[in-house]
Amino acid sequence: MIIHGFTPVRSAGFLISCSVFVLQFAVGQSKDSSQAISVSGFVDAYYSKNFADPASHANKLRNFDIPENQINLSLAEIVLQKKAQPIGFRVDVDFGTANDVVQGIAPYGTTPYSTLTNIQQAYLTGVIPIGNGLTADVGKFVTHMGYEVIESKDNWNYSRSLLFAWAIPYYHTGLRLTYPFADNFTVALHVVNGWNSNIDNNAEKSLGLAVSYSPSGSTGLMLNVMDGFEQPPPFDVGKKKVFDFIVTQNVTDAFALTLNADYGDETLISGLKTWRGAAVYGRYAFNAKSAVALRGEIFDDPEGYATGLGVPQLDVKEVTATYEYKFVDALLVRGEARYDFSTTPIFDKKANVNTVNGQMTFLVGVVAMF
């Protein structure tokens, strides 16, 4: 709920003021503590054109590049971090339409605005001296699920995959325990309040598991699992679970491949709902400044539940090509062409025209980092 006298505008201003204060404090502290506290961030903006000219001016089935035919501030982020030696912390403060989607606030959701809305992550971290060192994180943190992440600069493509948008959560609030059994084998356990939840909506905790293994320096394997009740009483009749599998392969120093596959289901009063999909990625770096990346994927949503469209036998595919160039280390520019298509006509077109089976978009994204 919104506290009387503490409107979204006032709270946003309050958070900005706090961020500036903490930033100044952190810089001062880092000078006195041999850079113990690191400060970084970026501003991410884009322009997208949908050639179907949708009357809604929205790219259907996207999550972080929804508005089209307009310049959009996707994400502005400030990160303050102190490594656990043995105690540390991390705080990510976010603003922009991508953050609105992550937090589920209007116009992309119904979650009331709060001071937590602009906190992507905020957790305490500590290393417990057991064996190789058990790391414990307590607070709000991004999910371990999926190959892609919220920040576009850390992905191979600018737009996010269907799997990232619809198959998995964005963040959790709770406890994360990580233990490195070896340099190439790590296991993490999560006990959290559920999917995209600051406060749990039922009496049960959700469990997460992340297992990563690198059989060689060029190959990486990861299995991620989420399992728990996600509906409020009296609708919490069954669990929601997702299995997420990732394989990465550096073929050469310049060429890399990735496979990401997901399966999820949830038991509701109305029955079992399922979703599944897979994405294949390839990236070739011409040099330190420029690279090209391709992504192809399929997402199957038989009951239309994961996407929220309610369309039966929904089968969606997409192909994305992205070229990137770094003018300087702190400025990343990307041009991207993407085609989404479905067995069912779900994509918007011009006013008074029926929906169509596909949409073609072109996007230019710019990220300035510090």
Predicted regions and their residues:
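Outer-membrane beta-barrel pore domains
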Residues: R62-D65, N99-V102, G109-T115, V149, ...
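Cleavable N-terminal export/targeting peptides
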Residues: M1-S33
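Surface-exposed coil loops of outer-membrane beta-barrel proteins
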Residues: K49-Q70, N99-Q121, V127-S216, M222-F229, ...
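Residues on the lipid-exposed face of transmembrane beta-strands in outer-membrane beta-barrel proteins
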Residues: G41, N69, L73, I78-K82, ...
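Glycine- and aromatic-enriched membrane insertion/assembly motifs of diderm outer-membrane
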Residues: I66-N99
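Outer-membrane beta-barrel channels and translocator barrels
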Residues: D32-S34, K83-I87, P129-N132, T143, ...
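Outer-envelope exported proteins of Gram-negative bacteria
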Residues: S38-F42, R90-G96, T135-G139, H190, ...
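Outer-membrane beta-barrel biogenesis signature
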Residues: C18, F25-E68, V142, Y147, ...
